């Protein structure tokens, strides 16, 4: 097996392809990406057999920005008989099992790309999952009792009703979510749907233990470009006191909590109160990404905050290059100032033409 499938948001196939090609080359693995615009996925084909499995183990999935999921896959199974799609899939897994220990598998996902065209196909996938799972269990798969994410997940990736890729992912280096998507319900108390972006970011970048430790009633936050309060809502919900910086009005429900101080100022000019220790800076301002990157770097280097989650709105062209420029600007400034830092970026499900970045720093 020499192929990876990477799911992504439609329209971001080129960025996903550029990123996986670069990350693979850093590991000394070379190949080429098959890209169909607006397909919602990319196939990366390695020149050498076995290297796709190596990439799936060695490229840290949490360091991939645009990929929602990373799967080692077979060649495309075509012309599956409508009366028995299961047998060819089982046969393919038995073949793969001679290369990888699939008796360490714990879960099955029967998936499609996240496109409007695939919605009808996803209905079939749901119905197909139960009989396929039963057939796989009869073969001894999906019964592994996992310890510390040591198992594998089986993936069937349908591109047409009679065509699919058969594959697997490593549980310690993948998205645990179906189709790589973390779906969240909109809280009716939140002032705007943008609240889902910060909610997903917190769940993506912080473990439950880290969230409890780093976001609580003893913490202070700043939300730049806060109006009407979608991101402020997520901080207040976790007990933080928030300086909400925006010339616009904040939702009355947030004022009623007594946990915000509305500062009607320019987010680029605002500085935190001198006697306040700011733990978190969040920012979802619509602005050139390089300006936002410079602003975040200034806050971190000046030690105005210790941790930040922010969005970078991406241009229509050369988006991956722009992301690299922005992250490089921030890391260069932190390196010059002698900070240790952890940085992670992700194109979240609730993001649109943007990515979300998390940075924590310490001297």
Swiss-Prot record:
Q: Name one Pfam family in it.
A: RlmM_FDX
| EC number(s) from the headed UniProt entry | 2.1.1.186
Which reaction does this chain catalyze?
A: cytidine(2498) in 23S rRNA + S-adenosyl-L-methionine = 2'-O-methylcytidine(2498) in 23S rRNA + S-adenosyl-L-homocysteine + H(+)
Q: Per its UniProt record, what InterPro entries does this chain match?
A: RlmM_FDX, RlmM_THUMP-like, RNA_MeTrfase_FtsJ_dom, rRNA_MeTrfase_M, SAM-dependent_MTases_sf
Its biological purpose: Catalyzes the 2'-O-methylation at nucleotide C2498 in 23S rRNA.
Which NCBIfam families does this one have? Answer: PRK11760.1 (NF008734)
Query: What is the protein name given in its UniProt record?
Result: Ribosomal RNA large subunit methyltransferase M
Organism equals Mannheimia succiniciproducens (strain KCTC 0769BP / MBEL55E)
